[in-house]
Structure formats: C-alpha cells, structure tokens
UniProtKB/Swiss-Prot annotation:
Family, similarity comment: Belongs to the histone H2A family.
Protein's UniProt keywords contain Isomerase: no
SMART domains, A to Z: H2A
Upper lineage: Eukaryota, Fungi, Dikarya, Ascomycota, Pezizomycotina
Subcellular location: Nucleus; Chromosome
PTM comment: Acetylated once deposited into chromatin.
Function: Variant histone H2A which can replace H2A in some nucleosomes. Nucleosomes wrap and compact DNA into chromatin, limiting DNA accessibility to the cellular machineries which require DNA as a template. Histones thereby play a central role in transcription regulation, DNA repair, DNA replication and chromosomal stability. DNA accessibility is regulated via a complex set of post-translational modifications of histones, also called histone code, and nucleosome remodeling.
Name listed for the protein in its UniProt record: Histone H2A.Z
One Pfam family in the UniProt entry: Histone
Keyword Cytoplasm: no
One of the record's GO cellular component terms: euchromatin
Gene this chain is encoded by: HTZ1
MF term (GO), any: identical protein binding
C-alpha cells in the first residue's frame, strides 16, 4: 500500500477544502478586541517561578482589561463632551477617574497633566458667605 497505515493519498481524508475556512484568532473567538496572545505572553513572562498560564486565564484577564478600558474611555468621553471638545486629554481622564468612586479606589496613580479636581472647602465657603451677609446688612 502506498499511503501506509490507512492514509489516503493526496491530503486529509474527509476534510473540506482549506480555502473555504477562515481562520479566527483566539481573541475573535472570545469576542474580544484586545490581543489575548500578547496578554498571555505578558502573564507568562511576569510571573514568579515561571508558572504556567492557562488559556482561559488569559482570556479572562483580557476581557477584564477591555471592560475597564471601555469604562474609563466612556466616562472620559462624557467629560470631554461636557466641556464641548472632541479630543480626550489627560485632564478628561483625570476628571472621569476621580469622579467615579470605584475607579478612584482602583486607580490610585497620578495622571500626568491631569490637574486637580475643582473643590472648595466648606469652611472657606462659610467665611465668604458670612462676609457677604455682614456687608449686605449694613
């Protein structure tokens, strides 16, 4: 027998033409936009003792990163829209993150060129109001 061990001649037996199939990445199969392969490589390279990283773990971490990014960008886009500009700047990111209580506790980093939140202490406001009342009474 020319093929040996039951193999047929001329390619795989019973398979469709490979031109009819389209290849899908792992990210596309999971419905993600972020690259699962890059995240998995990052996880493998940055773990202690060269631990193994499962495929599902990489998909899960990628999905979490994608969700958090979408959340921050949505809030920053709303902040930019409120200020009537079309470009998101670090200031808009700062306003978005510090305005949301959960994101503020999660992201404690200092954002470069983010500025500070507009806030006036109540004690200072009370002093100004008392001075105005004193001037209006006299």
């Amino acid at each position: 027998m020319p093929g040996g061990k039951g193999k047929s001649i001329g390619g795989k037996a019973g398979s469709k033409d490979s031109a009819g199939k389209t290849q899908k990445s792992h990210s596309a199969k999971a419905g993600l936009q972020f690259p699962r392969g890059s995240v998995k490589r990052f996880l493998k390279n940055n773990t202690q003792n060269k631990m193994r990283v499962g495929a599902k773990a990489a998909v899960y971490v990628t999905a979490v990163l994608e969700y958090l990014t979408a959340e921050v960008l949505e809030l920053a886009g709303n902040a930019a829209k409120d200020l009537k500009v079309k470009r998101i700047t670090p200031r808009h990111l700062q306003l978005a993150i510090r305005g949301d209580e959960e994101l503020d506790t999660l992201i404690r980093a200092t954002i470069a060129f983010g500025g500070v939140l507009p806030r006036i202490n109540r004690a200072l406001l009370l002093k100004v109001e008392q001075k105005k009342k004193g001037k209006s009474d006299s």
